[in-house]
Amino acid sequence: TEGGAVHTMCQYTSPQPSPNCGTYSNAHITAADKETILKVHNDERQKVKAGQETRGNPGPQPAASNMPDLTWDNELAAIAQRWVNQCKIGHDGCRNVERYQVGQNIAMSGSTAKGPCNMNNLVQMWINEVNALNAADVSSMPSDGNYFMKIGHYTQLVWGKTTKVGCGIIQFLDGKFYKCYLACNYGPAGNMFGAPIYQ
């Protein structure tokens, strides 16, 4: 437990999708999904590192001297998959591992047609939050709640001290829409208020 929150793997002991999900499919990350998720994350991180991210409010974003590529972590992915398998939209209460605190990004898309979830589009939703980020704030993560809601997925994705990512996906029928629900867990966690987003 952390601050009274029960860890996702302890709270939800079944590896199967919850009855909350109703009709579901695609309840696992494929090798191709993993490759896409890593590529989209690392393409943006390399772009930032090179000083080529021109977007922002205002931009351009500063270049980074320390921006390692993320690598996949199966433990983080297993916790993310267990969480999306609950079909509860939002962040889980505790997802930390012994190694470090763990951050999380979530995204959702919907379609009337059933088909594979588009990992590129889901991750791009987080990257597009750069449009709201004031480049001057990279040196110290702002704590303003309303502002954080607009930039927090992006800032975790490019957090300089984060090195690992692991994700889970599920597609479930919600009324007439097939919803794709993606969660990615990041270690060590980013979005520490007052700390540099990257250096």
From Swiss-Prot:
It is found in: Secreted. Pfam families: CAP. Gene3D superfamilies: CAP (3.40.33.10). The keyword Secreted applies. One of its GO terms (cellular component) is extracellular region. Its main location: secreted. Expressed by the venom gland. Residues 47-67 are annotated as: Disordered. InterPro entries: Allrgn_V5/Tpx1_CS (IPR018244), CAP_dom (IPR014044), CAP_sf (IPR035940), CRISP-related (IPR001283), V5_allergen-like (IPR002413). Residues 38-186 form the SCP domain. PROSITE patterns: CRISP_1 (PS01009), CRISP_2 (PS01010). It comes from the Eukaryota. Disulfide bonds join 21-87, 167-184. Keywords: Allergen, Disulfide bond, Secreted. Belongs to the CRISP family. Venom allergen 5-like subfamily. This is Venom allergen 5. It comes from Brachyponera chinensis.
